[in-house]
Amino acid sequence: MRILGIDPGSRKCGYAIISHASNKLSLITAGFINITTTRLQEQILDLIEALDCLLDRYEVNEVAIEDIFFAYNPKSVIKLAQFRGALSLKILERIGNFSEYTPLQVKKALTGNGKAAKEQVAFMVKRLLNITSEIKPLDISDAIAVAITHAQRLKLH
């Protein structure tokens, strides 16, 4: 089974695809979609086109998205919600469903502590997947963590 984990952002959208087979997790690919255009419509289109390419290329079975966190800037939250809405619609069209996890759920699943720092989550991602190189930016390790969290939830059900 292939799981796509997404950490949506207003400038960078982290993604990771992991394989979950025979109780073993392995990283297939990870990166981020850089959102560089200035018009919102173009940003959404760029994001959706990149998602389409990932879904086509890697034959994803499951998708998990990190939920919106609390932010002090209402404009950022609204923009992020628009991106998530567009991502959600495309995923529903292509896959049929998706799961959502809060940052607290992801941190707790990987570290046992819902208030863990991003660096602790990145450390556990590397440890669980036997990754020796540095994972930068942290949007990528967050996306991997979302995918791992979903794989753990699937094992429980």
Curated annotation (Swiss-Prot):
Cofactor note (record): Binds 2 Mg(2+) ion per subunit.
Residues that coordinate or bind Mg(2+) 1: D7, D139
InterPro entries attached to this UniProt entry: RNaseH-like_sf, RNaseH_sf, X-over_junc_endoDNase_Mg_BS, X-over_junc_endoDNase_RuvC
Positions of the catalytic residues: D7, E66, D139
GO molecular function: crossover junction DNA endonuclease activity; DNA binding; magnesium ion binding
Principal subcellular localisation of the protein: cytoplasm
EC number: 3.1.21.10
Entry keyword set: Cytoplasm, DNA damage, DNA recombination, DNA repair, DNA-binding, Endonuclease, Hydrolase, Magnesium, Metal-binding, Nuclease, Virulence
Binding residues annotated for Mg(2+) 2, in chain numbering: E66
Function summary: The RuvA-RuvB-RuvC complex processes Holliday junction (HJ) DNA during genetic recombination and DNA repair. Endonuclease that resolves HJ intermediates. Cleaves cruciform DNA by making single-stranded nicks across the HJ at symmetrical positions within the homologous arms, yielding a 5'-phosphate and a 3'-hydroxyl group; requires a central core of homology in the junction. The consensus cleavage sequence is 5'-(A/T)TT(C/G)-3'. Cleavage occurs on the 3'-side of the TT dinucleotide at the point of strand exchange.
Annotated protein name in UniProt: Crossover junction endodeoxyribonuclease RuvC
